[in-house]
């Protein structure tokens, strides 16, 4: 997704790039939930209400005002990061709140874009800035930094072909 977002920026498709970057930020939270708590929210599965409540401290179990569909919680992006913070070091990611606060305004740019809920265009500079922040988030999630993420992205990048 990160490489794909980079290609979209190169093509001048900034809203498309930011939509992919938004999904990348959400995917980081989903992977952390699966990795740390065994809670599978990939493929839109939703979080099973009982599983989530059992992992949270009792004083936090009623904190989340979320939609419930077929016995599963449907969490938004912000709520996934809050949940990771609230689950604590054993089942969560204590840095999650700090990470989300650092990208929250940028994620709002996606929400205001034509590909989401608004009509405000995303500029090239905004897309590139968001891309850098998302690389950093991926690196922090892996606990090995954005440089490692950049290196990994180079290994999966499409080869450049020049046509004459």
Model-derived regions: residue spans:
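Charge-enriched, short contiguous segments at helix-coil
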Residues: 89-156, 160-163
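Amphipathic, heptad-repeat alpha-helical segments
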Residues: 78-94
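Enrichment for repetitive, rod-forming helical segments
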Residues: 27-30, 87, 117
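Amphipathic alpha-helical interface elements
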Residues: 2-82, 101, 151-159, 164
């Amino acid at each position: 997704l990160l490489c794909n977002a980079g290609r979209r920026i190169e093509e001048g498709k900034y809203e498309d790039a930011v939509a992919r970057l938004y999904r990348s930020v959400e995917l980081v939270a989903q992977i952390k939930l699966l990795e740390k708590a065994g809670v599978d929210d990939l493929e839109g599965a939703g979080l099973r209400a009982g599983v989530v409540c059992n992992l949270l401290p009792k004083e936090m179990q009623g904190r989340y005002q979320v939609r419930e569909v077929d016995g599963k919680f449907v969490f938004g992006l912000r709520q996934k990061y809050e949940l990771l913070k609230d689950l604590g070091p054993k089942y969560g990611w204590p840095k999650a709140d700090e990470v989300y606060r650092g990208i929250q305004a940028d994620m709002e740019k996606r929400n205001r874009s034509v590909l989401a809920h608004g009509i405000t265009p995303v500029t090239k500079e905004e897309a590139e800035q968001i891309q850098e922040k998302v690389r950093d988030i991926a690196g922090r999630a892996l606990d090995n930094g954005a440089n490692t993420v950049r290196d990994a992205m180079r290994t999966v990048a499409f080869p450049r072909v020049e046509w004459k």
